[in-house]
């Protein structure tokens, strides 16, 4: 939220983070509220844990090594592209680049020739179908862009799919899918402006 709107209260963010950290169960997971009334509270345990770790890492909090390891283990076991993508982004955010690259390599191998990825179950908001494809592909594109040696072909496939998933009204399906797609495409636009190596430009005037 802070990256989108600088006016967000830091104390509110800290309270939210502390609430999540206090929900740690000591085994690498987070305790869920059984009284949750919305789709965020209805996601499966592995999806919820992966999303919380991803969110905390995006916010810059690093004291979650145990939770990250648990999410990574479960993602490898399940082979679910959605949780693997959340895990890969968290790994990169926390400086675990080698482990992040390994997770990305697994995702690339799982893509096949279809040009997009989809989760095996549902997303944190219990999205399925086209929205799940868009959310998963967006998260994977974000991870691909963070890789130490970005796979240009995989990146291009993901971008092509996301651009094609946009509706005539400018959305990409569900609210969550639209947010992630816009974030991923914005990061791609920044990435595409980079040069491969440092250099100088000479301007010759005749």
Feature-to-residue mapping (PLM):
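Large, well-folded core regions of big proteins
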Residues: 1-206
């Amino acid at each position: 939220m802070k990256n989108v709107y600088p006016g967000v209260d830091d104390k509110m963010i800290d309270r939210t983070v502390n609430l999540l950290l206090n929900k740690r169960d000591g085994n690498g997971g987070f305790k869920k509220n059984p009284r949750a009334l919305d789709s965020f509270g209805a996601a499966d345990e592995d999806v919820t844990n992966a999303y919380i770790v991803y969110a905390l890492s995006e916010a810059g909090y690093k004291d979650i090594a145990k939770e990250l390891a648990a999410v990574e283990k479960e993602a490898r076991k399940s082979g679910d592209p959605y949780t693997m993508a959340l895990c890969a982004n968290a790994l990169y955010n926390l400086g675990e680049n080698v482990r992040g690259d390994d997770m990305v390599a697994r995702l690339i191998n799982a893509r096949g020739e279809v040009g997009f990825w989809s989760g095996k179950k549902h997303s944190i908001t219990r999205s399925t179908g086209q929205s799940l494809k868009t959310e998963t592909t967006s998260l994977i594109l974000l991870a691909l862009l963070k890789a130490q040696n970005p796979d240009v072909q995989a990146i291009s496939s993901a971008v092509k799919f996301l651009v094609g998933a946009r509706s005539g009204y400018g959305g990409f399906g569900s609210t969550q899918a639209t947010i992630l797609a816009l974030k991923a495409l914005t990061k791609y636009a920044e990435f595409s402006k980079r040069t491969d190596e440092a250099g100088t430009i000479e301007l010759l005037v005749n």
